[in-house]
């Protein structure tokens, strides 16, 4: 009851003041997903990967950070230089346990470690009664304790997802059954096949009904989910979850007040090209942002769906090779709670892309967002286009795409055979809503080809030509400013368009206002969604060179 009252008080007070957006505090020494650990009330650390001699340390609860030498007792990581081991504190003993991302070979120093005397005490390899080292197989993520802390669960993958479980605090381990997602297949918008790596990188959370919920990365458009009723020993058949996300890592976190926080990339990759066979890693086109949502009812409904950060390098012409050719982007996360309302999280892969950030989760409850291009320069927009030649590790270089000119984003079509698509677009995120209103000031330039405006429940590339097939609502305005033969805009003149949708979960229609006046134009709901609308996507539909295009001057979203 006390937690409920605290939560209600917190939410009521939210309306009394503005909440700061998430902000960067440091760059972690390893890719996000492992190695971030609270040590005391004020101290938090981020450990490095194999070969690392320095760790990142905060002594003021995550606000400031410095690089310091690893403690002499800490056993060096043995797996990958770019990835730290997973380190967790045992809630029963207060000691720490460590797992490498992967155990391979016969390294005598390779195995599960536990501490005696705290994180800077003695680290020892775990051995069973026969003297064998504990080395759970597969690629592993962070452990959780379930069933009143009687069991440790580690999500792993290899040929599908499974869990390793231990009922003796990590001495011996058993493995669950394997759950799999279906292979991606060509068809529809896909001429080729995505990299079919199967169901991998699962995240786990114990629900209040004692079920364990698994959500995992797949090659499909959605993360897949599975449930266990016996604390991770057996798992149900995996099925699509409500969460969009393609070949990106999801992460659950239980807040101290009981709410569930979820970090993932609510993004869809570009359609697969004909040369994609599904047998190897592809060019990743949907890792430029990471999102957060929060649930107060054990995952039945979710609030937020907000971009936490857009990749600072997303428009770079040398995106795929700058500072080396490793994996890159903003997907992957790990979370530490700081206080009642704030969390610290790591996100991203690659030394110039990964970040440590602080978020006040009350920010997820906001119901409005605005962008004035003349003032903000479209810094919170995705506009880039892809140069369709794979470079580095699974990447495309980029061009900036639509640019800000005279206080507006100008969407053109510039012929360039190197691009995935010469048509320019722009996409912008706002808090999700089952019902809401998006208002935009736009101008069809004289001689331009018109404008497509789509409302979506996920991020699409600005230059994705297939958005109209997957958006929840689509408004197509031709070069003359007409919608289905009805004049609504005058080329060369700035207009204010508002799309008002109601009940997207039940496929409710949307209405249209122009310059503050209602029209009789109905915008049908193409696809219902249980997660609400959280994006507006603008696109130049030209079929030939368009040097005039259309302009977007501002946007405002308000949701319920």
Language-model segment annotations:
Residues 9-18:
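Hydrophobic h-region of N-terminal signal peptides that target proteins for export
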Residues 377-412, 422:
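Extracellular glycan-recognition surfaces and repeat-rich motifs
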Residues 239, 424-430, 483-489, 541-542:
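Beta-strand-rich interaction surfaces with strong enrichment in secreted/lumenal proteins
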Residues 521-553:
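Flexible glycan-contacting loops in extracellular carbohydrate-active proteins
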Residues 473-498:
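Short, aromatic/His-centered strand-loop micro-motif at the edge of beta-sheets
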Residues 440, 493-504, 510-512:
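Short tryptophan-centered beta-strand motifs in secreted/extracellular beta-sheet-rich domains
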Residues 406-479:
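Secretory/extracellular carbohydrate-interaction modules
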Residues 19-378, 388, 398-400, 415-417:
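Asp-box/BNR beta-propeller blade signature and adjacent active/binding-site loops
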């Amino acid at each position: 009851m006390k937690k409920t009252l605290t939560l209600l008080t917190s939410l009521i007070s939210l309306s009394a003041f503005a909440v700061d957006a998430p902000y960067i505090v440091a760059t972690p020494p390893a890719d996000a997903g492992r190695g971030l650990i609270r040590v005391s009330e004020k101290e938090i650390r981020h450990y490095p990967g194999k070969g690392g001699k320095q760790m990142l340390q905060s002594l003021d609860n995550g606000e400031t950070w410095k690089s310091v030498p690893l403690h002499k007792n800490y056993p060096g990581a043995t797996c990958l230089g770019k990835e730290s081991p997973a380190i967790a504190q045992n809630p029963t003993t207060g000691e720490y346990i460590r797992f490498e991302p992967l155990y391979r070979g016969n390294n005598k120093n390779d195995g599960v470690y536990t501490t005696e005397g705290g994180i800077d005490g003695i680290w020892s390899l775990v051995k069973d009664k026969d003297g064998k080292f504990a080395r759970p197989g597969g690629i592993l993520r962070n452990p959780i304790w379930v069933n009143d802390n009687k069991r440790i669960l580690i999500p792993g993958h290899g040929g599908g997802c499974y869990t390793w479980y231990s009922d003796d605090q990590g001495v011996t381990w058993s493995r669950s059954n394997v759950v799999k997602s279906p292979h991606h297949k060509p068809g529809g918008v896909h001429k080729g096949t995505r990299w079919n790596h199967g169901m991998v990188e699962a995240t786990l959370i114990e629900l209040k009904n004692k079920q364990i919920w698994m959500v995992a990365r797949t090659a499909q458009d959605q993360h897949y989910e599975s449930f266990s009723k016996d604390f991770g020993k057996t798992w149900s058949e995996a099925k699509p979850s409500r969460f969009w996300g393609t070949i990106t890592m999801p992460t659950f976190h239980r807040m101290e007040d009981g709410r569930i926080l979820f970090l993932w990339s609510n993004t869809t990759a570009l359609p697969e090209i004909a040369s994609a066979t599904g047998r190897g890693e592809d060019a990743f086109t949907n890792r430029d942002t990471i999102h957060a949502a929060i649930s107060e009812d054990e995952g039945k409904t979710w609030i937020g769906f907000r971009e936490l950060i857009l990749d600072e390098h997303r428009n770079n012409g040398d995106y795929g090779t700058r500072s080396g050719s490793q994996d890159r982007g903003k997907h992957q996360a790990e979370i530490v709670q700081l206080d009642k309302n704030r969390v610290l999280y790591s996100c991203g892969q690659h030394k110039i892309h990964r970040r440590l950030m602080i978020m006040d989760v009350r920010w997820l409850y906001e119901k409005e967002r605005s962008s004035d291009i003349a003032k903000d320069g479209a810094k919170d927009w995705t506009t880039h286009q892809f140069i369709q030649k794979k470079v580095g590790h699974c990447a495309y270089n980029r061009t900036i795409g639509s640019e800000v000119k005279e206080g507006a984003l100008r969407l053109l079509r510039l012929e360039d055979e190197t691009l995935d698509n010469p048509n320019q677009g722009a996409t912008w995120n706002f808090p999700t809503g089952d019902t809401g209103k998006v208002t935009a000031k736009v101008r069809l330039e004289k001689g331009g080809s018109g404008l497509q405006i789509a409302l979506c429940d996920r991020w699409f590339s600005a230059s994705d030509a297939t958005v109209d097939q997957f958006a929840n609502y689509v408004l197509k305005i031709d070069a003359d400013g007409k919608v289905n033969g009805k004049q609504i805009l005058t080329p060369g003149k700035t207009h204010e368009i508002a799309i008002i949708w109601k009940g997207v979960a039940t496929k409710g229609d949307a209405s249209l206002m122009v310059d503050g006046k209602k029209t009789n134009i109905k915008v049908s709901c193409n696809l219902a969604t249980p997660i609400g609308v959280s994006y507006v996507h603008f696109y130049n539909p030209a079929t030939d060179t368009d040097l005039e295009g259309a302009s977007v001057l501002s946007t405002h979203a308000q949701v319920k």
